[in-house]
């Protein structure tokens, strides 16, 4: 857990990181508005998602039903279409899901890792590339994931 928190502290563009373990339990590391990173986890598969104090945050959480998991079920790494964040009402999430295979899977005991990017940081990064041209961030299917200010106007 500490390693994920340290990485997130160094990468402010990450809103959350989720880990689906090889026993199908789930850990979610989520950045709050005050930049504090909170950890949620499941003690049983598809059971309640609880915070560090044991308080139930989501009573019946099934990671395999989340948009980032459904979009990547074909065992490929993938960008996922924007979807409603379950732990940040009114906010859209954009995730990249990474399937862990081979020696890394054996070492980490993790099946999937998903990272939610912060829209503001992504858009600011695209703005830095060029303020005079439209800059689009596309996924392989040519779907627009994000765009700079000029392209948003």
What residue spans do the PLM features occupy?
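Hydrophobic beta-strand positions in blades of beta-propellers and related beta-sheet-rich domains
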Residues: 26, 95-97, 144
């Amino acid at each position: 857990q500490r390693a994920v928190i340290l990485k997130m502290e160094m990468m402010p563009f990450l809103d959350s990181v989720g880990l689906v373990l090889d026993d199908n339990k789930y850990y979610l590391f989520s950045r709050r508005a005050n930049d504090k990173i909170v950890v949620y986890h499941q003690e049983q598969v598809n059971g309640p998602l609880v915070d560090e104090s044991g308080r139930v945050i989501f009573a019946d959480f099934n990671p395999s039903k989340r948009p980032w998991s459904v979009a990547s079920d074909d065992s490929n790494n993938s960008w996922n279409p924007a979807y409603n964040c379950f732990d940040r009402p009114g906010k859209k999430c954009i995730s990249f899901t990474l399937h862990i295979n081979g020696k890394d899977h054996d070492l980490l005991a993790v099946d999937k890792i998903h990272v939610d990017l912060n829209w503001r940081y992504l858009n600011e990064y695209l703005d830095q590339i060029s303020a005079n041209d439209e800059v689009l961030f596309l996924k392989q299917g040519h779907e627009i994931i994000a765009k700079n200010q000029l392209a948003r106007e």
